[in-house]
Amino acid sequence: MARVDNYEQRFGGIGRLYTPEGLARLRQAHVCVIGIGGVGSWVVEALARSGVGQITMIDMDDICVTNINRQLPALSGNIGKLKTEVMAERVKLINPECVVNIIDDFISPDNQAEYLNRGYDYVIDAIDNVKTKAAMIAYCKRNKIKIITIGGAGGQTDPSKIQITDLSKTIQDPLLAKVRSVLRKDFNFSQNPQRKFAVDAVFSSQPLIFPKMGEGCEVSATMNCANGFGAATMITATFGFFAVSRVIDKLLK
């Protein structure tokens, strides 16, 4: 009997779900993940466990102890290490043949042309800087690069409220609302609320839960180490899994 390829042994369950032809497509796919934090780290995990053949990660942040509540690589022994490097090691344990590229930088309007023009089959945006998100989405749209954006995952407790819609239609998400505003103001996206942006967005319809007074500094719209909304793994991970599910569906169509 012929020896079954190790890749097929590891990801045969994916092939039975998405067909052998679908698995072969995933094996050839190249997906870029921007932001390897509370959402992005779970995105990378799901891509790796789905047999995606090449993953590029863009981030230069290190792991801090306050990431432990929501980020996959955040363990006691990893504090201070780069998130991308820890996740790259993990991906190789899941799929040794996966090509993992690390871009040790934060994406910005100044470098996005260099970092985004690398032949990706899909870009997954998991950052929380409004102007950077907007500029990146606009760049991808102009250059016909497939992108899905992910909204704010902080301040929520109910994963059943997470969904995907066009970026023009999200609700209860201040981050994506600000991104919409910048896209319309600075990048000539349609002002007509009935017109879609043709960009998928992951968001939650749950009203935000704000920290009680005295539980930290001023509340920011992010989930950083010092202040901002509280966050839980079952929400941040689910945001990431929704994004990967949509990306796989699009890759296989």
Show the residue positions of the predicted features.
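N-terminal charged helix/coil linker that caps or initiates catalytic domains
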Residues: 1-32, 65
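Glycine-rich phosphate/adenylate-binding loop
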Residues: 2-5, 118-122, 127, 132, ...
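Conserved N-terminal Rossmann-fold NAD(P)-binding element of oxidoreductases
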Residues: 33-35, 58
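Hydrophobic/small residue at the entry helix of a nucleotide-binding pocket
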Residues: 39-40
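Acidic/polar active-site rim loop that often engages polyanionic ligands
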Residues: 66-73, 156-166
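Short amphipathic alpha-helix with an adjacent loop that forms part of the alpha/beta core around
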Residues: 110-119
